[in-house]
């Protein structure tokens, strides 16, 4: 983490002693993977920060007090109490700690303010549920994420993970491809069981989507992320191998011709 950002957050905590602030998610995950497996993937373009206080207050404090920056913009997303900062080409997402409740499979969750431990419980995989808390310089690892990084395994956090948000399946394939990790047997069995049962129902929707509107957006966002990767064919192959390719389209037939077509798409895209 940039030294001036670390110092600025530390100053904020000194002035707000009852507020906990932590780094969480991909920044911590990739740093640990780099250290444990001596694999150079740690090139942070973004940092996720969670606070038990107001995300807006923390963001405004950083913007006002951080030194030696070229640019600092704030975008607020009120619905989830999150703020995006851009500092010297580094994107910083600040969120107020929250817990989520899905009233029906795939619907956008109802959120409530929570503490850091509860916030970690809402995340997708154990390797993304590791946090570093500033004031006590403490590591939160409630779900053995460090152990799973050592074992190179992807573990879902709970039994309803895929039912709540099946876009996590696509993210799982991205992580498996990019990091060289494998999905745990228990997580794979959950995924196959839920996809086969297909609990996501559309109510009063005029589109042709097979998912509720909010979930359709999350699926498209994950597909957009896939398209950025050079290993698009490998990601599709993984979903097919895991027998959950129907999450994309029930009529997809993945064969060598199909995979060659995906590789050509990536090559053509690279020429424009």
Residue locations for each model-derived region?
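Catalytic cores of the polymerase beta-like nucleotidyltransferase superfamily
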Residues: 1-272
């Amino acid at each position: 983490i940039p030294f001036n950002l670390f110092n600025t957050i530390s100053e904020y905590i000194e002035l707000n002693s009852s507020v906990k602030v932590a780094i969480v998610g991909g920044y911590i995950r990739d740093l640990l993977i780099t250290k444990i497996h001596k694999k150079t993937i740690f090139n942070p373009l973004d940092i996720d920060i969670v606070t038990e206080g107001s995300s807006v207050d923390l963001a405004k404090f950083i913007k006002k007090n951080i030194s030696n920056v070229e640019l600092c913009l704030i975008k607020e997303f009120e619905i989830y109490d999150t703020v995006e900062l851009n500092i010297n080409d580094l994107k910083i997402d600040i969120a107020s700690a929250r817990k989520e409740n899905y009233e029906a499979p795939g619907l956008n969750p109802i959120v409530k303010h929570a503490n850091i431990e509860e916030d970690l419980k809402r995340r997708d995989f154990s390797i993304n549920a590791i946090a570093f808390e500033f004031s006590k310089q403490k590591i939160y690892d409630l779900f053995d994420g460090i152990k799973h990084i050592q074992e190179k395994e992807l573990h879902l956090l709970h039994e309803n993970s895929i039912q709540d948000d099946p876009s996590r399946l696509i993210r799982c394939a991205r992580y498996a491809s990019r990091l060289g990790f494998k999905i745990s047997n228990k997580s794979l069995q959950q995924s196959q069981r839920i996809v086969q049962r297909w609990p996501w129902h559309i109510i009063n929707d005029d589109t042709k989507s097979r998912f509720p509107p909010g979930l359709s957006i999350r699926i498209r966002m994950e597909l957009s992320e896939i398209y950025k990767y050079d290993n698009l064919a490998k990601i599709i192959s993984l979903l097919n191998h895991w027998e959950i390719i129907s999450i994309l389209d029930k009529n997809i037939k993945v064969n060598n011709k199909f995979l060659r077509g995906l590789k050509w798409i990536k090559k053509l895209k690279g020429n424009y």
